[in-house]
């Protein structure tokens, strides 16, 4: 890791690799699974298949 510029480039590459933006959860999903989809969460297989989400959804806020 040489500097902040390199980290920024890797973040840009990760954004390009995502095939489509993830749609926000519907009200039914929020009621069923809870509202904290952006928090680190371990999902069961049924939810993974239904929502096409990865098994572990992790959200790391950028450091301030």
Curated annotation (Swiss-Prot):
<keyword id="KW-0244">Early protein</keyword>
<feature type="compositionally biased region" description="Basic residues">
    <location>
        <begin position="1"/>
        <end position="10"/>
    </location>
</feature>
<protein>
    <recommendedName>
        <fullName>Protein OPG053</fullName>
    </recommendedName>
</protein>
<feature type="region of interest" description="Disordered">
    <location>
        <begin position="1"/>
        <end position="28"/>
    </location>
</feature>
<feature type="compositionally biased region" description="Basic and acidic residues">
    <location>
        <begin position="11"/>
        <end position="20"/>
    </location>
</feature>
<dbReference type="InterPro" id="IPR008726">
    <property type="entry name" value="Poxvirus_F8"/>
</dbReference>
<dbReference type="Pfam" id="PF05886">
    <property type="entry name" value="Orthopox_F8"/>
</dbReference>
<comment type="similarity">
    <text>Belongs to the orthopoxvirus OPG052 family.</text>
</comment>
């Amino acid at each position: 890791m040489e500097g902040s510029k390199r980290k920024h480039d890797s973040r840009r590459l990760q954004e390009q690799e995502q095939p489509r933006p993830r749609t926000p959860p519907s009200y039914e999903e929020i009621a069923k699974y809870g509202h904290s989809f952006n928090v680190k969460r371990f999902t069961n297989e049924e939810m993974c298949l239904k929502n096409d989400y990865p098994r572990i959804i992790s959200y790391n806020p950028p450091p301030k």
